[in-house]
């Protein structure tokens, strides 16, 4: 059995290894989503994130002719494979892109 590499000796990681790792993370995230979706009242999609939340407030704002959206979410869960804790008390999002809010 081979142990870990000696300090200062990097082990090459292939693109396939990275892809398999990210696929495993994505599958784990999907399973977590499936387990928690029933705890929430809303699905919120922005151009950068996907959220579950129990309270959502969307305000349409303008500034210098530009239209943007301010979102406030309470008691939320964030779809993000790189976050160690996906449950958050509150989220504030400002976006110039489309926003989709659906009641579950």
PLM region descriptions:
Residues 3-104:
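Conserved RNA-binding domains used in RNP assembly and mRNA/RNA metabolism
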């Amino acid at each position: 059995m081979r142990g870990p590499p000696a300090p200062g000796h990097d082990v090459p990681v292939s693109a396939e290894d990275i892809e398999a790792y990210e696929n495993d993370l994505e599958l784990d995230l999907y399973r977590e989503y499936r387990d928690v979706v029933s705890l929430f009242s809303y699905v919120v999609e922005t151009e950068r994130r996907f959220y579950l939340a129990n309270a959502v407030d969307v305000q349409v704002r303008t500034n210098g002719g530009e239209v943007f959206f301010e979102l406030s979410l309470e008691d939320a869960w964030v779809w993000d494979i790189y976050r160690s804790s996906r449950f958050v008390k509150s989220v504030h999002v400002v976006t110039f892109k489309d926003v989709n809010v659906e009641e579950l």
